[in-house]
Amino acid sequence: MLKAVKIALGLLSLGAVVVLGVFWYMETRHEREPSRVTFLDHCASCHTASGGGSDLLTQYHTNDSADELTKRILVQHSDLIKSAQFPEPMVKALALYVIEQRQELPSITNSHAHTIPGHVVESLHHDFKVELITKVGKGPYSIEPLPDGRILLVEKVRGLSVIDTSGKQGALVDGTPQVWPEILQVGGSFAVLGSMLDVELHPDYATNGWIYLSHSDRCQLDCGSPWPISMVRVIRGRLAGNRWIDSEVIWSVDKNKYTLVPDAVASGRLAFDHQGFGYVTVGGKSTYDNLHVMDTPYGKIHRFKNNGSVPEDNPFWLGKQLSDPTSSRKTVWTYGHRTAQGLSTDPRTGKIWATEMGPRGGDEINLIQRGGNYGWPLYTEGLDYNAEYISIGKELGLDFEFSETIPPVVDFTPAPSLSNFTFHNGDQFPNWQNDLLVGSLRAQVLFRIRIEEGKLIEKERLLTKLGRIRDVEMGYDGFVYLLIEHNQT
């Protein structure tokens, strides 16, 4: 008995040390970031407001892209690069750091402040105001406006609730899947296994009342693992008052695909095309060696019929007779994704688009095409967080040409941490019609993106320093609704 107590205490102590170590790492990683340290050691004495040279951080060549500034540094500071023995990717990392400062990108830890402008905001095509509807708890993830003016709200560690037309948030809806408290919270980022994610209405919601939820289904003790594990799952049900009824599982994977990787990279975004097929994003909830294995769900976008059956024209399905029941290949639509945090349908064409977070740089807006390989982790415009090239793809033996991948329609480098988005489709702001309204987390910016014939035409910052914009949706009244994430209770 005494030995068992000692072992238990030892495990608790080890767990406490691990938690404290993770907390310290997350809270201090900005100060330890290699390109920041290198800039302060080698560049700041000249290229800041207090230095003797041009202020790279604010005043000089402010429209440089990362590639352009990298070339400029290589040409103008070749002697320093040689004498300091900068590794090749460090020059690009320095360029990213400089542009991040110009764009006033906060560190992730410091990105949770939020300010609602009290004045009319001027923009290229429309002036507008931002109005507060309601304040919600910590960890909001998604919203879905209803035809009657109410709004469905999902909070990761609380669940589903309804905001009425007066802005009052109701009690949690009874009968939805269980969610679990966070294991760890650092600066507003949650480490959790078993959270609620996205909410989406059936295309014919007005007649059938179906509501789709994605969540991270948690399994413990009876899954062959001594630890809790989780995986993205899609269900649908209806609301009867404040109760969730008629619930049924629409998309899920075998329990042997559940993992210990926290839900922060689960993704779980939902969308429907004009034919009524549903799509769900699954992030890298596994080691990277699984992202290009078709029998696994990770790093992919999956397609299903709205009743949960499998479309027979899915590109990697082998048919009922040949399919392994534990495989998820039957619903794979695209692969090679990192963390697709946004999913939306073009109202003109019914085509599916996605936003994807890169590492340090390489955030993307992608047109989702049947069977497409989106390249991660072999190809990306981003760097690793240690200021090195992303090498994991080569280390895993991935071998395909860039020409075999589908490149992003829009690349964001540096990375603003793109989140969810919508296509503008309403009467209140007609000059934005069909433009993408894209949220971002770290940058705290609402972007307006105009794409024509697959090309970027306009990119505008409609709102800055608003807060971490987790979701963007169109209301039935033609107004744009934003969900701001924060770290307050």
Question: Each predicted region: which residue ranges?
Answer:
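Gly/Gly-Pro-rich "capping" loops immediately C-terminal to redox-active cysteine motifs
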Residues: 33-36, 44-78, 170-178, 291, ...
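Electrostatic cytochrome c docking/interface patches
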Residues: 19-38, 266, 329
